Amino acid sequence: MVKPKYKGRSTINRSAASTNPDRVQGAGGQNMRDRGTIRRLNMYRQKERRNSRGKVIKPLQYQSTVASGTVARVEPNIKWFGNTRVIKQASLQKFQEEMDKVMKDPYKVVMKQSKLPMSLLHDRIQPHNAKVHILDTESFESTFGPKSQRKRPNLFASDMQSLLENAEMSTESYDQGKDRDLVMEDTGVRNEAQEEIYKKGQSKRIWGELYKVIDSSDVVVQVLDARDPMGTRSPHIEAYLKKEKPWKHLIFVLNKCDLVPTWATKRWVAVLSQDYPTLAFHASLTNPFGKGAFIQLLRQFGKLHTDKKQISVGFIGYPNVGKSSVINTLRSKKVCNVAPIAGETKVWQYITLMRRIFLIDCPGVVYPSEDSETDIVLKGVVQVEKIKAPQDHIGAVLERAKPEYISKTYKIESWENAEDFLEKLALRTGKLLKGGEPDMLTVSKMVLNDWQRGRIPFFVKPPNAELPTDSQLPPSSPLEVPTETTQNNPEEETTETEVERSDSITEKEPEGDCSQDRNSEMQQILARVRQNFGKINVGPQFSADDLVPVEMSDLEDLESSGEEEEQEQEQPGEDAEEERSPDTQEEPVGNDTKAVLRALDEKIAKYQRFLNKAKAKKFSAVRISKDLSEKVFAKYKEEKKTSAEDSDAAPTKKARKWDAQMEEEPSNKTQRMLTCKERRRAARQQQSKKVGVRYYETHNVKNRNRNKKKTSDSEGQKHRRNKFRQKQ
């Protein structure tokens, strides 16, 4: 209870209360008040002291002691009339240019934006003649009439010529679709999809889930399909984040990189890295790729936000691109429901990756665009089982995928059109209706399922991937529109190459400079991506045209350097197993199969020598007594003498067999010794999967085995029997 005559305390209490900054740390913990805070709180509680007549005896600390009526005097100093902060125009221009470069660089982050004059940058970007609502502030009469208050009106043009030029420029840049002031006649007819299933991912509920994830996350990860990265991007969401949420970090994850060649993955990473940080990823619980690099990147983002206890990472993207699979891969166990169909994730959910990083799974969202129904189906947005006429989309599958891949997948050599292909496939797979008619509906669903799940090899080539056939010709202009792997007319291709050759002869030097600039730019971009793309286990088998592009020398150098860096860090045994995998596509263009086999044999022999050295070092560390070593060497010399005497005699049958075995041993040395786990796995594979089959082989059931010939016991049965006898 406060004393009735207590007027507040201005000094510091020396007791053990919270107003003593020097008290012993006890129940208060670490966050105790400091001396300045205690003085400030005491100041709030103070009251001036007055006598019985109401005159102030003791004023407050922050009150002035100057008597009332005294004339205040300001010190005459030039600083009162100068600017508080002065910056030169050249310095401001330099700061603006440097800041613009940093803001456009996807691999740089501005740490303290609040302490920088960001308003100067944004205001200077807008032109002086930006359109404003001038009539609301200055009327026409106050500018041009007899009551005008301005000497010179602010006009866009100073003369008729400039006015004509401005009118022509505005006419050329006019877009009727973007004109919101245009009066449109509403006829009540709109262009919409025929079926509701083609509107999946566009409902208000799904978009509400998306905005929840974006608002709750500090880092937004857009998952893309490596087969068609530009087709699965969402430019609307990217523009929304850049305009409305510029403080949130956006990165790209190129998932399903095991379905495309390695060079295409590398080129797409280089192209997409110009906009946002991009990582190649393969979602798999058993054999993932890019998991360590992704977790390291998230940790770096966590270090940027030191003011927060934890950060949230939201995963967005098209349906069926693998958002939930990426989260399961990062956690190394199933925490999200996954399925090879679209729409498995219904609502957003939080997953804990580590103490300071949380992951948010989001349903797939599709922005309404001009994509046809076939494009929507082939992107995997729609479930195949719900399509009423799946045979209408088979023609696009046959156009986008190469015929050699189709024939290799379905064992069909040739076809005339989509219907002919479906009929042959139905006859081959036995999908027939009554009367032997082919079941077109079921077969077309099979093909679409194979397309969505990656069983048909297909990928969209990155920009600048299709170059002229002559290696001496320089490439075309950088960053063109990506083209799909379709079969073109050979006559058209020959004419195009001839035209390109004629143009390249006339303009050879400038195009060569452009190609050098583009290669150097590619090298700078790929130098930032610390990923060994040679470790990607590519599943589909591509042809020679798709495996190695025409101009990939700049990327191969970076790949080899990245491999050398990682080989120094990792164990050689692991590298041997990874380099033996046939899926790595790092061989040069001119290598044939013999050269590849020769290179693999050299690598195997190299690692075999390394293992032998390791074994020798291991046994050399064991110390043997001197007496025992002398006895062993004496026995060894005697055995060597006897073997030399026996070798003079004629070789026997056993000796011949032994020599034959010794000759076969060097060829088997290169083979790797199987571990105990691999031997047990091979034994399990040889055994039959059915239960109770061996019973009929060893027993006489229904007089089928009248002689009762028991088969030889396995090693496991012999071991158990001997163990049982020893116990007795």
Curated annotation (Swiss-Prot):
Q: Name one GO biological process term.
A: ribosome biogenesis
Highest taxon, organism lineage? Eukaryota
Residues the record lists as Phosphoserine modifications = S504
**Residue stretches of biased makeup (Acidic residues):** 553-586
Ranges of biased composition (kind: Low complexity): 480-489
Q: Where is the composition biased (Basic residues)?
A: 718-728
User: What are the CP-type G domain coordinates in residue numbering?
Assistant: 207-368
Q: Where is the sequence biased in composition, kind Basic and acidic residues?
A: 498-520
Record keywords? Acetylation, GTP-binding, Nucleotide-binding, Nucleus, Phosphoprotein, Ribosome biogenesis
* Localization of this protein: Nucleus, Nucleolus
Sites where N-acetylmethionine occurs are at M1
The UniProt annotation places GTP binding at G317, Y318, P319, N320, V321, G322, K323, S324, D361, C362, P363, G364, V365
**Keyword check for Acetylation:** yes
Biased region (Polar residues) positions are 10-22
Pfam families from the UniProt entry: MMR_HSR1, NGP1NT
Entry GO MF terms: GTP binding
Q: Which GO terms describe its cellular component?
A: nucleolus
Query: Where does the record place the region Disordered?
Result: 1-33, 462-521, 538-595, 636-728
Read off the Gene3D superfamilies from this record: 1.10.1580.10, P-loop containing nucleotide triphosphate hydrolases (3.40.50.300)
Q: Does the keyword Thylakoid apply?
A: no
Family, similarity comment: Belongs to the TRAFAC class YlqF/YawG GTPase family. NOG2 subfamily.
| UniProt subunit comment | Interacts with LYAR and RPL23A. Interacts with the nuclear importin-beta receptor and, at a lower extent, with importin-alpha.
**This chain belongs to which protein, by name?**
Nucleolar GTP-binding protein 2
Q: Which organism is it from?
A: Mus musculus (Mouse)
